[in-house]
Amino acid sequence: MSNLERSISFYCDVLGATLARAPYDGDSPSFSGRMALVVLGALALDLFEHSANEGKRFDPSCTGLDHFAFVAQSSKELQTRASWLDAHDVPHSEIRDAGGVGAMFDFADPDGIQLEFLFVDPEKLQQLASYSHVAESQ
């Protein structure tokens, strides 16, 4: 994170995460900087502001994390999440098909880390699984 407080605000105030561990300084052989822990549903995110970072933004084309998705429990929740981002002036894509298993939209955090809300429709997933088993047996 290039600005830990800004990231905490985004994940907590915009996405609804809970600050589980307040910002603190870390200094070890593997990390020097500040960190905090936020929890969103079943996901815990350690937010790191590395001392060695010279203000560079996240680049999804580099080796490592491309993006991660938060799971919406329904298509209604997906729409609610998109509306919530609109209310917080966070740009996002349109809700669209997610490879035939549901719907999704993407957006980015303040450092440009690609994020996604994804709804996987259990009926479509079951149909896809059934089709895969039929195709494998032929």
Set out the residue ranges of the language-model regions:
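Amphipathic alpha-helical "stalk" segments
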Residues: 26-43, 52, 59, 70, ...
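A short acidic-to-branched-hydrophobic micro-motif
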Residues: 47-49
